[in-house]
Amino acid sequence: MARVKRGNIARKRRNKILNLAKGFRGGNKNLFRTANQRVMKALCNAYRDRRRRKRDFRRLWISRINASARINGTNYSKLINGMKNSEIIINRKMLAQLALNDPKCFEKIVSSVSN
């Protein structure tokens, strides 16, 4: 039976991991075993944080809306409840951008909701 040499396959596998480890510090970019561990950890963190990013941005938007709503004499929960009751359909991202970039428009929304 012919001898099977796995040089190319093993080298490709290692180079794939080492390429993913570019930019890491110390032996984490050069040594295969530590690079492999760091890459696996990085991929796990990236997977987790892609989901977490959505939560973090929603929290940020809510904080911004609440701060601007309090400046205009109401709070977040009353504002959102009033918007639902008066059938104003603006999502939290757009509302936060309005509060940040166009306070006059946000103030009009708050006044129309509170009436």
From Swiss-Prot:
GO molecular function, one term: rRNA binding
Statement: the UniProt record of this protein carries the keyword Ribonucleoprotein: yes
InterPro entries, A to Z: Ribosomal_bL20 (IPR005813), RIBOSOMAL_L20_CS (IPR049946), Ribosomal_protein_bL20_C (IPR035566)
Family annotation (Gene3D superfamilies): 6.10.160.10, Ribosomal protein L20
Residues in the signal sequence: none
Pfam families attached to this UniProt entry: Ribosomal_L20
Any Gene Ontology CC annotation: ribosome
Keyword check for Ribosomal protein: yes
Function: Binds directly to 23S ribosomal RNA and is necessary for the in vitro assembly process of the 50S ribosomal subunit. It is not involved in the protein synthesizing functions of that subunit.
Protein name in the entry: Large ribosomal subunit protein bL20
Gene source species: Prochlorococcus marinus (strain MIT 9312)
Lineage: Bacteria, Bacillati, Cyanobacteriota, Cyanophyceae, Synechococcales
